[in-house]
A protein has these predicted regions:
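Hydrophobic alpha-helical segments within soluble ligand-binding/sensing domains
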Residues: 203-233, 273-281, 337-356
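Short, Lys/Arg-rich nucleic-acid/phosphate-binding segment
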Residues: 42-48, 75-88
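Periplasmic-binding protein-like
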Residues: 99-101, 158-171, 231-234, 267, ...
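Amphipathic helical "hinge" segments at domain boundaries
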Residues: 18, 22-29, 34, 38, ...
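An alpha-beta-alpha
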Residues: 216-262, 266-267, 359-378
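Flexible loop/turn connectors
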Residues: 276-392
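Extreme N-terminal segment that seeds HTH/winged-HTH DNA-binding domains in transcriptional regulators
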Residues: 1-55, 62-65, 115, 155, ...
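Flexible loop/hinge segments that line or gate small-molecule binding clefts
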Residues: 170-213, 298, 324-333
Length: 392
């Protein structure tokens, strides 16, 4: 956040049909929103601002009078204007609105993301309503949109929001280029929070699941059941502006194995195409691991089906574990990430950043994961135990 009013970014457009004093007022409100909470900041005098922006004194006067009417600033005894300490609270209002950026039509977004999207959306909407706030989906401009179109989108929506939540990148293509997201990140006047990922900006917060606890619990179970040689099957990620926490999952699995005294004998990243053949190659290795930890439950299902087609039995010939924990499947051991809790924490972070600003203390929040047992990790002849159906 800025520590003072940044007048360099205020550029009223004389060609616009919108009156100059309204443009100036909106720009000043944006700058006030960018200030840290409870900061005493004086405004430039009407005369100085008029000279700086090449505007009439009457234009700056009308913009300042509107700020006074909004009760965002107060007049001091020397007639100068000071930003009120409660200005941000007044902007928030009694019914806050949080925007969730999505790169496509909402129905298509849910259809494309299916099982992964719904728990996050439930958490976002549920927590928002509990805080007497509204959560709205905002379809971002297309990647081909011009900078002016992207700014028009921000000008239309951001002034009425207390924050924005990012579910991922805004480009539909797996490329490092994400021009819409890159431009929207320049708007420091509004809190921005990422779910299950991060962005390379100090003014953006992140809420993620910490894989360490769940993986450590699983590693202890592997040791108790006599497993020692473990493999990790990940997936390839192309570099993108939005950094998904899932990109670090394979490394987190390998670190957990090492940390818990287990041997990681294989690490393989599946390609986007030809995954079936890649899995077959892993399963036919003469040094095939005793256990395979998979990037997610979908990958584990693919490994399971491929193994079965090759005559391999799970868990008799190969033990298996997934990640992200599909509800209602007691067969597959997995790591539960609680997406609803992550989404709720993101809403809480937006409200916290709006009221108190962002700092090193509240920029990142990690929620613990937990191991959920399944029959796929049962080792015949070593342990006889019932696998509890503790998935919700």
């Amino acid at each position: 956040m800025n520590t003072d009013i940044d007048y360099t970014g205020i550029r009223p457009d004389r060609k616009s049909d919108e009156p100059l004093h309204i443009q100036l007022h909106r720009a000043l409100v944006r700058e006030i929103r960018s200030l840290p909470p409870n900061r005493h900041v004086a405004l430039m005098s009407e005369r100085e601002l008029a000279i700086r922006l090449n505007l009439s004194r009457r234009t700056t006067h009308r913009a300042y009078e509107q700020l006074l009417e909004d009760r965002l600033v107060r007049r001091r005894p020397d007639k100068s204007l000071m930003v009120r300490q409660d200005a941000r609270s007044r902007m928030l209002g009694p019914y806050p609105v949080i925007g969730v950026l999505i790169p496509m039509d909402f129905s298509q977004f849910v259809q494309n993301n299916g099982r992964n999207a719904v728990p996050y959306l439930e958490g976002l909407i549920g927590c928002s309503s509990g805080l007497n706030a509204s959560c709205i989906m905002l379809r971002s401009p297309e990647a081909s949109a011009s900078p002016a179109e992207i700014e028009a989108f921000a000008a239309e929506h951001f002034p009425r929001l207390c924050g924005v939540i990012h579910l991922g990148g805004l480009s539909r293509f797996n490329t490092p280029c994400d021009p819409v997201l890159e431009q929207l990140l320049k708007h420091t006047e509004i809190p921005q929070v990422c779910i299950s990922g991060s962005l390379p900006e100090d003014h953006v917060g992140s809420v993620c699941a910490d894989p360490a606890q769940g993986l450590d619990e699983m590693c202890q179970v592997l040791k108790e059941r006599g497993f020692r040689r473990v493999g990790v099957i990940g997936r390839k990620f192309e570099p993108q502006l939005f950094h998904y926490i899932a990109e670090e999952r394979s490394s987190a699995m390998c670190d957990a194995l090492t940390r818990n005294g287990l041997e990681c004998v294989l690490r393989a990243d599946l390609p986007d195409t030809g995954t079936g053949a890649a899995v077959e190659a892993i399963l036919t290795r003469p040094d095939r691991p005793e256990v395979l930890l998979c990037h997610n439950d979908k990958t584990a299902d693919l490994v399971w089906r491929t193994a079965r087609s090759m005559g391999l039995r799970i868990p008799d010939d190969l033990a298996l574990a997934g990640y992200d924990c599909r509800p209602g499947d007691p067969r597959l051991a997995s790591i539960m990430t609680s997406p609803g809790d992550i989404a709720s924490a993101a809403v809480e972070m937006v409200m916290d950043h709006f009221r108190n600003g962002i700092s090193d203390a509240n920029r990142l929040r990690l929620l613990p994961t937990k191991f959920v047992d399944g029959k796929s990790l049962y080792k015949p002849g070593v342990h006889k135990r019932n696998i509890k159906k503790n998935r919700t």
